[in-house]
């Protein structure tokens, strides 16, 4: 498997996940002068109207300092209580990690080890007339434009990766408000990275509250397989067009689908390939992965190598009604398109067909096929 960095997947922060349980650490990091907050409004981040960058709140900007001084000290008193719930407070807050190697004076001692860096938090603003915090507490950022996909794909991978991490945690906090075991309100603990049932009545059984560990109190990530289909010499690549429209352009891409319970990555790939295209493929290699914050997927990028025998490679779209078209394309044609690609959300291919742009794992998988084809040709030529 490749360790190449994908968009949204850059290692930016040391998450120091073992420190989230320390209330002292969270209090100190929330209130430190160097701390940075990435604000979201109703689940979406903001773009600076001045320079188009992802908005990050810190005390170095006066208007942002006014916001932080109004909310952070009060929110700190709500930590690990039901009053911190966004329905009551008007905000969700989650600790993202420490940006190491900065000139921040933040320092925390834990087990005789010193942890240093700039603390980063995600902040989702969901204020109403009845919440503790009000809209006026967050002026002027309520007038800022919200991030669109077009915006985020123009950001640096560092900022996009911070955005992705914050968005996934905050989306989860916003969606899961009540305990599936007893219906009581859930409230965030461990700096917004875990949810806890608020039911204190021990006469009421709750399999969430009483379990030593369970999977509803932690953030969820949905594993999704995405596969570039090729043949044994990489001279062909199967690309498909979904019936879903993506703007006013024609997009052909790789095969993708959610994994199902009790399914291996390889079996999920084999199933998705057959269900969507009718192609029989048994040879699956895992290539690389990409976080995808829409809303909380982990794209597991794979290569499917089809043994052509006039049967395996035959396309049949009649199983699943998801695709509009699927075709085997010559890899040489794709290479020509990638060679001309100058960046952007999509790659012009042939006729009116476009391929996914470089911020997607689909692009990297398609490029992986092309590079394997070129390398195989070089090896063959060297033996002549």
Swiss-Prot record:
Obligatory cofactor(s): Mg(2+); Zn(2+)
EC number: 3.6.1.-, 3.6.1.22
Residue ranges of every copy of the Nudix hydrolase domain listed in the record: 219-351
Chain location of the short sequence motif Nudix box per the record: 257-278
Keyword Ribosomal protein part of the UniProt annotation: no
Residues binding Zn(2+), per UniProt: 179, 182, 197, 206
Cofactor remark from the record: Binds 3 Mg(2+) ions per subunit. Binds 1 zinc ion per subunit.
Residues the record lists as binding Mg(2+) 2: 272
Molecular-function GO terms, alphabetical: metal ion binding; NAD+ diphosphatase activity; NADH pyrophosphatase activity; RNA NAD-cap (NMN-forming) hydrolase activity
GO BP field: NAD catabolic process; NAD-cap decapping; NADH metabolic process; NADP catabolic process; RNA decapping
A GO cellular component annotation in the UniProt record: cytosol
UniProt entry keywords in alphabetical sequence: Hydrolase, Magnesium, Metal-binding, NAD, Peroxisome, Zinc
Disulfide bond positions: none
Subcellular location(s) of the protein: Peroxisome
Binding site for substrate: 256-258, 272, 276, 322
PROSITE patterns (alphabetical): NUDIX (PS51462), NUDIX_BOX (PS00893)
Catalytic activity entry: a 5'-end NAD(+)-phospho-ribonucleoside in mRNA + H2O = a 5'-end phospho-adenosine-phospho-ribonucleoside in mRNA + beta-nicotinamide D-ribonucleotide + 2 H(+); NAD(+) + H2O = beta-nicotinamide D-ribonucleotide + AMP + 2 H(+); NADH + H2O = reduced beta-nicotinamide D-ribonucleotide + AMP + 2 H(+)
Pfam families according to UniProt: NUDIX, Zn_ribbon_NUD
Record has NAD as a keyword: yes
Residues binding Mg(2+) 3: 272, 276, 322
Binding residues annotated for Mg(2+) 1, in chain numbering: 256, 276, 322
Note: Present with 846 molecules/cell in log phase SD medium.
Function comment: mRNA decapping enzyme that specifically removes the nicotinamide adenine dinucleotide (NAD) cap from a subset of mRNAs by hydrolyzing the diphosphate linkage to produce nicotinamide mononucleotide (NMN) and 5' monophosphate mRNA. The NAD-cap is present at the 5'-end of some RNAs; in contrast to the canonical N7 methylguanosine (m7G) cap, the NAD cap promotes mRNA decay. Mediates the hydrolysis of some nucleoside diphosphate derivatives.
Subunit details: Homodimer.
Protein family according to the UniProt entry: Belongs to the Nudix hydrolase family. NudC subfamily.
Name the UniProt record assigns to this protein: NAD-capped RNA hydrolase NPY1
Species this protein is from: Saccharomyces cerevisiae (strain ATCC 204508 / S288c) (Baker's yeast)
